[in-house]
Each structure stands twice: as C-alpha cells, then as structure tokens.
Amino acid sequence: MVSAQLHFLCLLTLYLTCGYGEEGKFSGPLKPMTFSIFEGQEPSQVIFQFKTNPPAVTFELTGETDGIFKIEKDGLLYHTRALDRETRAVHHLQLAALDSHGAIVDGPVPITIEVKDINDNRPTFLQSKYEGSVRQNSRPGKPFMYVNATDLDDPATPNGQLFYQIVIQLPQINDVMYFQIDSKTGAISLTPEGSQELDPVKNPSYNLVVSVKDMGGQSENSFSDTTYVDISIRENIWKAPEPVEIRENSTDPHPIKITQVQWNDPGAQYSLVNKEKLSPFPFSIDQEGNIYVTQALDREEKNSHVFFATAKDENGKPLAYPLEIYVKVIDINDNPPTCLSPVTVFEVQENEPLGNSIGIFEAHDMDEANNINSILKYKLVDQTPKVPSDGLFLIGEYEGKVQLSKQSLKKQDSPQYNLSIEVSDVDFKTLCYIQVNVIDINDQIPIFETSNYGSKTLSEDTAIGSTILIIQATDADEPFTGSSKILYKIVQGDTEGRLEVVTDPTTNAGYVKIKKPLDFETQPVSSIVFQAENPEPLVKGIEYNASSFASFELIVTDVNEVPVFPQRIFQANVSEDAAVGSRVGNVTARDPEGLTVSYSLKGNMRGWLKIDSVTGEIFSAAPLDRETESVYRVQVVATEVGGSSLSSTADFHLVLTDVNDNPPRLAKDYTGLFFCHPLSAPGSLIFEVTDDDQQSLRRPKFTFALGREGLQSDWEVSKINGTHARLSTRHTRFEEQVYNIPIRINDGGQPPMEGTVFLPVTFCQCVEGSCFRPAGRQDGIPTVGMAVGILLTTFLVIGIILAVVFIRMRKDKVENPQSPENKPLRS
C-alpha cells in the first residue's frame, strides 16, 4: 500500500511540475485513446490526464467502468481497484467534457482499457483421474485418449500456454516408455515400443502420472498440476488370418469369399494393397472385412499371392499396421508332360556290352513338383530302324535311363536309331524323341604333342582367372564324338586346387588358368602333371599310357605381404572388478614371409589395456568400469619386425560384465517436494530410485526403509513396485520448515548394495496450490524509514510548488484588476 501511495504522489508531482498547459506522455487533449494496463496492479494508479478548454469544467466517465475507473474534475483518469483480466479483458468507456451546468461540450470519445495478462492462475486438470483403454498393437502416435487442463490466463501469452508430460509410468519394464503424450494437446498414444510389446495377458493395465505446466513448461516459476491416468490394455482382434488355400482353375461362380479381417471397432473402412502390382488384381474386400477371390487362379502362372488388408478411419488415416494375407494356389493336373528339346541325342560305341547305360532321358511337367500330378512315367513305343532287330533299347519306367537290351550295335547295320518315348502323368500323354548315334569304338588314346611344357615363373599375386599355359593333345578316333573329345585334369602337384584346365570343344586345346590365389609361402615350386582322357570309355584292352600325360613346373615368386590375422574381430569377456594386470585376452597374427610380428594397441583412449608386444597377450592396465563403457574397443596393430615393417590391424572388443558396485540413488532431483501448511489431512509423495549397475531382464527389486530411528512416528515409507515408493505423513502436526527425510534403499543384488538418500520435504504456506516463500530484504528496495522520508520530502516539494502558484496568482490579480476573476458578481 505504501509503494502504491508513493507511486501516486510521484505522478502527481510530475503533473504539477510539468504544468497543465503542456501536453506530454501523461496528459493530453480529449480524444479517443487506448491504454494497456497489467492486471493485479495496486489501486489508485493514474492512467492519464485529459485536458480541455472552457467552458468545460469537469468530465463524465461512462461505460464498462465496473466501479473501478474514476476521473477527477481536473481530468485525472485512474483505477480504484486492481484489474482482473479473467473478469474482463477489455473495458470500453466513454468520456465527455461538461460545462458548469452539466451539459456536454466535448465528446463523448471512446476510451479503451486493455487489461494485460500476468501469470496469476495455475493450470488445473478437468478431472483428478482419467480412465482409458487401448488395443494392443495399435498404431503408434495415434491418440486413444486425451487429458485436458484449463488455465484462466491469456492463451495468447506464455502465461496460458500449457505443457503436458508423463511423469511416471507404472509398470515401466526395462526403462521403456510404452506411452507418450502430445505436450500441447494432451493426446496420449502408444510409442513404437508400446505398439510392439503391450500384451493384456502379461500386464492388463498401466498407471500414468501426468503433469501440466503453464509458461509452455519453459520457466522454473511456472505453475503446475498433476492427474492420474488408468489405462487398460485390450486384446487386438486386428490380426492376420491363417494362410488361405485355393484350388487353381476353379469353375465355381466368382467372386468367392476366402477369408475375413475385422477391425476392433465398427466403422472402419477396409481396402486391399496389391503388393506385387498384379494386373488385374484378382482379390477384393467389402466393408464387412470379407475378402474375395474374383477370378480363377492359375498355379503355373503364380503359385502364391501375398497382399495386405488395411483399415482406415473416416478421414482416410490408417488405424493400425496393414495385415499380410497369404494365399496358396493348390495344384490340379492341368498340364501335360513336355519334352525338354525336340530331339535328345545320345552316343553309343560299337560293340558296347549288353546293359550298358546310354544316357538319362528327362521330360518336364509344369504341375507342382513332388506331387502326383507331376510324376512322369516313360515308355519306349517305337524304334526306327528295326535292324538288326526291334527292341534293341529299353528305358527305365520312372528314372528314364536308356540301355542296350539285346546286343551290341554295329555302325554298318545303322549309324543312327530314332526312338519314340511316351511320357505320361495321371491324365496326359506326350511323345518325345531320342536319337542314338552309333560311333566308332574308342580304341585310340589322346596323345600330348609334348610330354614336358617346361617351367614358368609367376608372382604370387597373379590375378585369378589368368591363363598361364596352353596344352594340346590329339585323338585319332571319330571327330566330334565322345571318343575323340579330350578332357584334361591335373593329377599331381596341385593338391590345393589352385589351377584348372578348360578344354576348347573345337580344337581340344587345354587352357590352364589360375583358380585360387598362388602362395609362395606354402608352395613356391609345383611340379604339375596333366592327364588327357576321353569322356567315352576305352575299349577293352586299350589303356591310357605315358603319351596321355605331360609335365609342367610352376615357380611362384614372393611378394611382401602384411601380417595376417586369423579373424577380423577378437572378443573377450571379463568382470569389471578384474585386478589391474589381469590377462583379459590374446590375439595372434602370422607374417606370410615368416618374419617376427610385433604387437601394439591403437585407440586405447582410456588406457585400460596393455599388450605384450611379443606374444599378443592383452592385460588390464587400469581399473575397469562397466558403467563408464560396457564394451571397450581397441585396435591391435601387427607389424613386421625387419623387412618393410608392413602392418595390419584387427579389432579387439572387451565386454565388461557387471558387478553390483553402485548403491541406489534417487532417479532425479526432488528439491521441489512440498506440503501446504497446515496439513488438513495426512499426505503422501511418490519418488523413484535407480542405480548405475546393469539391470537384468527382470525388473529391479529395490526395498525401502526409513533411514533413522524415531522417524516412524511421523513418517512412513511404502514400496509401490521395484523402482517407486511412497513417502507418507502419519499425522498433520508438522511445523512450517524443511524436513530432510533419510530413506535407506537396498538393491537386492549379489552382493547387495545399500545407500541412504535424503528427500527434502518443505511444509509451507500455499498460494493457489503452490508454495509461497516471502522474499527477504533486497538491495535497492526502500525500507519503511526510507519510505517515510521520501513521503515527507514529496509533501515539502508540493508545498513549495503550491506556494509559488498562489504567489503568482496573487501577483496576476494585482497587475490585472479588471480580469474576469476580479470583477464583482452582478446582482
């Protein structure tokens, strides 16, 4: 009140010293004006001084004054009470100037008072408890319920901008939040983890504590409120149906219902997504979720179909993830056997013995493999010519093996036979044809043009696929038959299979190529022996001899190579409490040239490890800490000793297993806990604890107790779950002060760790539900004595000014005796 009076007197002094004849910031002529005033200001605050000219002698103020706004005769406009924006945000007034008879001589003009907002209202939830439900596997980010709070402050200013957040989720499994809230709208939805993991069988309900703050949640001085949210988890019936089987080429009337999907609530709009972009797409869905096949399907064209069913709301937004629909097309026997080629050609030597296999004949059926519809039977139905007799050949009924059945063949009887083969499945038959060419007997062996191809020197880094030698053998048997075709193989000197020989079918030349990398260290010199042979067997009495063999010497030269690790990543596990100097792992590398290898570490940023440069053994060099780094990664460098000092690297990962070496602690800062004094009833507060050790898949199991004897009569601590507890008062007789309550917490580990934390709980007077702390003495703010001095000084200045004014007026009367003020009144 004193400060308000001082403010009013200062303004009055300013008006008096400035004079009424000059227009300034605080005074001016009568005209339409708009003023902005913060709500909550002390009363008797001067707003403006309006000035007018004779014959006006006073003012009249009308409109939405609400008994608050007044105007003095000299035009001082002020308010008598503190303004409240929530009661009226804008006051529309009318101001007129009146003469001595009360008649309007100027105006009225509109005067607008805009009440500016201050943060004098706390946000309040519309309900102290909300209840909602959500289906498992619902789409993350899609709201399933809202919490709403109101704040009477101006929503266009930060004072009325609300910020929602989830403070506690119970239960909270593995520190994973299953729910999220839109900080501006209060919309609650599932997180991606919640969409995947919520299961009504495991946890049918969850409890949330939600807070709302004004000032957009950005100020420490913002007001807040909390509410409780109970959420039940409902089973999701939006599930993919079992795979569907449809028999191909159905003659039933279409469309045919094959399966159904169903959204959890009525009103969903269903559609199918053609994943494979088939045209036309042979499936449809109605608004009951029934899925139909719209036309006959062909298994040979496509043996299965995969597409998706979607459910959307009335705005076309997806309600959940699409469901995969799998349709398998069941085979029917609708395809006859087919021949792989118009004519299959086999060769047989003269005089081959009875029963020899000539070849394996194969046909194909497009019906489903390993199915009765695709099992084929073979039958020989004709032989041309029938010389020297019919029935010279036979074929296996199922395997298709063609053999000589009566006697050996002679080229002079017929150089060629044509066989007709009937191939059949359950319902169909097809004729295929085999041509059997009778060729000269294989009585000539391949002969190399030289028995020694000398030597060749190559570096060990010669590219794979390079041709290093061409060898040649000849065969005097009938050209372009199996008796004269030559195949080359390496029979000696290449046990690792580093080389291969490819035959030119026209010239029978053999191209020797590198198949695998050469290696100087394992085989610097190779004595290679080639053999040339025919695919057709030699006649009895003829054997391959030295003419069918040739030799070659391959010399491999060294290329200096980096040391080689047997693997790219080495990994070891060790307990974080391992003693300094403990052996934690070992790495090895080999230098291809046989040089000694030296080991060193790279990227050992924390200095936790050291390595034996000779053996590659790795030891701890400092205390390890899993909470600082659970997997410590370094690189091991292997360097040649001598030579070119080439080096290579491998990764070493040290996985630290946890030791229960961290005591429990509060999960966050709890310095803002308070109760309004005096307590009307016993109250309680919820707090959360954690520790820095690795949490197992099971939830933490902290236990709680008061940390000092004698507190049990005033306080009680009770466990909510493995991480949360409730601190409750046992009575209401607490003094207005801060209580630091010790809480003893045990983590139940092996070995168990115990810690004592202190919860500061303040008992204080409350204003609008928040703790009110009166401000102390601050520099720059006047004391009561100073205020009295200022007040007396102000009165003194006013007295001097008034004296000057009266003296000047008296002087004017003397100098102007006929002025209107000095004329006597007429009778």
From Swiss-Prot:
CDD domains: Cadherin_repeat. Residues 29-127, 128-243, 244-339, 340-448, 449-565, 566-666, 667-776 form the Cadherin domain. Residues 808-827 are cytoplasmic. The chain crosses the membrane at residues 787-807. It is found in: Cell membrane. One of its GO terms (cellular component) is cell surface. Its main location: membrane. Gene3D superfamilies: Cadherins. GO terms for biological process: B cell differentiation; calcium-dependent cell-cell adhesion via plasma membrane cell adhesion molecules; germinal center B cell differentiation; homophilic cell adhesion via plasma membrane adhesion molecules; integrin-mediated signaling pathway; marginal zone B cell differentiation; oligopeptide transport; positive regulation of integrin activation by cell surface receptor linked signal transduction. Residues 26-786 are extracellular. Keywords: Calcium, Cell adhesion, Cell membrane, Glycoprotein, Membrane, Metal-binding, Repeat, Signal, Transmembrane, Transmembrane helix, Transport. GO terms for molecular function: calcium ion binding; integrin binding; proton-dependent oligopeptide secondary active transmembrane transporter activity. Glycans are attached at N148, N249, N418, N545, N573, N586, N721. Residues 1-25 form the signal peptide. Highest expression is found in intestine with lower expression in spleen, bone marrow, lung and testis. No expression detected in liver, kidney, heart, brain or skeletal muscle. Expressed in precursor B-cells and myeloid cells. PROSITE patterns: CADHERIN_1, CADHERIN_2. It is a single-pass type I membrane protein. Cadherins are calcium-dependent cell adhesion proteins. They preferentially interact with themselves in a homophilic manner in connecting cells; cadherins may thus contribute to the sorting of heterogeneous cell types. LI-cadherin may have a role in the morphological organization of liver and intestine. This is Cadherin-17. It comes from Mus musculus.
